[in-house]
Structure formats: C-alpha cells, structure tokens
Amino acid sequence: VPLRRAGTRLLAATVTAMAAGIVAGLLARLLMRAVTVLAGGEPGFSLAGTLAILLVFAGAMLPGAVATAFGRRRSGLVLLGLGAAVLMLESVAIGLQENPGQLFGSGGTTTVLVVLVMLAFPPVILGEALAVWRMTSALAARRTVPAPRDDARARR
C-alpha cells in the first residue's frame, strides 16, 4: 500500500473509531448515570471520567477499524468483536459496582428498570462496532486521487 493511501486509510480508521466512540461512549455514560440513580447514589458527571469513557470506547474499536481500513475484513470483524466484548464486560462490571444489593434487592420496579438499563448496553456497543466497520469500509474504499485514464482504452 503506497504511503499516501496508507495515511488516508489510517485517518479513515481513526476518524470512524473516534466518531462512533464518542456517540456510543456518551450513550453508555447516560446509561451508567441511570444505574447510579437506580442504586440511590448521587449522580455526577466528572469531565475526566466522561473523557476516559469516550477514550476507552474509541480505543476499543481502533484496532478493528485499522484492520478493516487496510482491507482485512475478517480480521477487522474479529477485532471489532473483541473490542465490543471487552466493552460489554466492562459496562456490566461498572454497572454492578454500584450497590448490587440496592439494585436487585429492592424488588419489583427497580429490578425491572435495572435489567432494562443493563440490556441497553449491548445494542449501543454492537451498534458502535457495526458503525465503525461500515464507515471505515466505505471511507477506505474511496480513492484519494483519481486513477489516470488511458485514452486508448477509453475509446474502445
């Protein structure tokens, strides 16, 4: 892969991983806040915490995005899947760090709401992985410089 094309593909991978990571990270941050509220905790947004979540969500998708941008579609899918699995594991672990006894011991409505909030994490994360794969594939397929036309071939 020529250096210019490699740079373009790397940029496409980085931009798509960052864009999808920001959107999915913000949605996950809101879901984490909902879990905190349901646990009876004091919800708070720290800028450092939010930026860390956005960075983790973007960083988890970057290896898969780079592999996809360089035409390694299967490797890209595997890496995106692994990144999504890590994010799901961490999302559940962080959600359950809030007082689990309070979350599931309250019974009734609170338990149902907690389960619904926890079930919202996988679609957000899988949506992020799918968006990264599709956007990276589309951007990497675009040419940066049009190929020179051979007039003799064009006339045939």
Model-derived features: positions:
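Juxtamembrane/disordered regions of integral membrane proteins
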Residues: 1-156
